[in-house]
């Protein structure tokens, strides 16, 4: 009987200790993972808008470089889909993808062909269709061989400047909300706030991790893979700018950082997480295929499928090992919300 009690105590003690660690880990995630990323996003978006003012030519190397840096900064935060990013559909205003009905090129073409005056200010432009806003709309204007030369050049220039300013305004608001009040709401739960306990706060972070991995596997990789008989390379994310693989690399790196910061002080679990993320990134780098064009070739397609399987292995570890450590129920589905 005594041995049984000791065994139970030993089993319960680690979970109690981790329960005491949860507030510290949540604060660590907020201050080391979330806030610096949104600050960088706001800074890079401001730089993009300023660059567009100086040179709005879609062939401009300076504009393309600033666009890439700002888009990278968004990818570094794109998994954090809660709180300030969801106010007024801000995340969708920055990143409307996948666009299954081709709404973005249609919306942009309509603006250009009619020379709609709504582009005169970013404030007014914030009322247009979300499909015509953000980084994916800007990719069409800069890299699409048709849209980049459609209509009046002066109007396209003004449109580029307005979209970049709209991006700056949106990311500045997200960063300000996180810095001024939402960080405190996540780290200091209350009965009147969005999180009533530290457990609810850590579940939000776990959901961001799980959903980010699921989106990478099912959408960023799943869409271009299609089926064996019908691969869809042109469904890859941002293939026009050659960034499809890069988006997965940045996202996995950000999720890696979140997973390790969220994990308890369990060396075996952390080693398992690090190994799984490193393996997926290594397989991704080995593709040497920026836009997943190789999915049409059976032998090369297998390599892309292996990357997807590697991401799914991370998801398994998150669900089966990390989830229970955090006290997230086994039946919790990241796509179901709270």
What do the PLM-derived regions correspond to, one by one?
Residues 6-7, 17:
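Cleavable N-terminal signal peptides
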Residues 1-4:
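Positively charged n-region of N-terminal signal peptides that target proteins for export
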Residues 20-338:
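Mature extracytoplasmic or organellar-lumen-exposed domains after removal of signal/transit peptides
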